[in-house]
Amino acid sequence: MKKSLLIGSIKSISLIMLAVIILSGCKKDEVEEPVSLIKKATITLSGAQEVPAVTTSGTGTAEISYDPTMKMITYKITWQLGNPSATTTNMHFHGSETGSDLVSSGVAIGITGFATGSAGLLNGMTIALTDVQAAQLLAGKWYVNIHSSTVGSGELRGNIKFN
């Protein structure tokens, strides 16, 4: 009886050890955070970035996010023109294949819904970009431009460069 009890105990201990070894090899699946494809940039708007540069005390910022899946730009633009009695007359995304920090480019996408006073804050989203536009944007060939009644060609510009 002692022998069968000893054999039973050895079998039980062996099964427990086997279970521990098997279960210790099973790791809990680690959940990886999804990789965000969204590109982001925070840019400063100034007259010094205009081509040619303009003299203004106006300033602004633009928080730009680009979703390559949807091919859309989401933006938050804040600005203050240099002349408090000036009005904001137009706002655009500019860009082209030959675009750069040192070149003025044509309008790629207009921005609407902005305040027409000398200062404002605007949140918005663009229409879907074409493949060509998306490639230009990602290559740093686009910029934001704010036109005013004081400087019709553009008072504030910010070149879009993603991190």
List each language-model region with its residue ranges.
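A short beta-turn/strand-edge loop motif at beta-sheet boundaries
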Residues: 82-87
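Acidic glycine-/aspartate-rich tracts in secreted/extracellular proteins
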Residues: 80-81, 96-101, 149-152
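Bacterial N-terminal signal peptides that target proteins for export
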Residues: 2-14
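Transition segment at domain starts
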Residues: 32-69
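An anionic, turn-rich surface loop/hairpin at beta-sheet edges
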Residues: 100-134
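Divalent metal-coordination and catalytic microenvironments
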Residues: 62, 90-94, 144
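Bacterial Sec-dependent N-terminal signal peptides
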Residues: 2-4, 20-43
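Short, exposed beta-strand-loop hairpins at the edges of beta-sheets
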Residues: 134-136, 143-157
